[in-house]
Amino acid sequence: MKLEHNALYFKEKIANPCTGTHFQLADRSHFICNVLKGGSTSWEMFFAENRIVHTKIADCYADVKKCPDTSDIKIIQVRHPFERLLSTYRHLFKNGGWKSLDAAHLSDPKLEQDFIRLFSKSWPQFVEEVVIQNELYIKEDDLRNINHPGSWLKTHWAPYWWTCDVCGQLPDFVLKTETLPWDLPVLLESFGLESNLNFPDIRVTGSDDDFSEGNRVTKEFIGKYYSQLTRRQILELWEIYKTDFLLFDYSIDKYLEMLEEL
């Protein structure tokens, strides 16, 4: 069985302990798994603004009493895999976001130089060398350890099937960032909350942001960036994220059409 298929049915460890979150509303416990660059910061702000008690999976390891054995409502939130990949590049690479997300380089001059070289790559280099060729190679056990150098950064472009226990969770709701304005009212009502409750739209940038693109949404730049890639690269990216595309009914068509229009 292929690794990604096996991961759909069995997950020995939760891969992303800092975005998988238990939260409580009116004596009911719920759970959301959302990926990095897939709206996780917006949910953090939503919990804080509405004083919703929440506990990350990472904190459950320290005190299992903080986390329930079962959840009333289980949620997975996703985003188009290619839009999320570009959002990752803009944040970590173009705008230098990697510097504040991995402190290991601060005490290791060689690692710092390696990271500077890696995260200075152009968009086509990132796609070809880092994603397709897997230049930032980290063993799977180390990748599941968020304190291992580079693992937290690489998780930003890890597929959904790897990050969330997709089928094991049996989610009650699958939210998409693209349809969130329509999805949220239904979800909020299921929580017993007002359907028009404000949900923040948080866009995280890095310390090197020169604001050449402003704090604008990534979808505005899809054509600018993906038109720099070859058909082979886009198809190879699709192979890497194929399970995510098929699971959540996303399409590659418009990305291929961009190349045909050039």
Regions of interest found by a model, annotated:
Residues M1-L262:
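Membrane-interface amphipathic segments in extracytoplasmic regions
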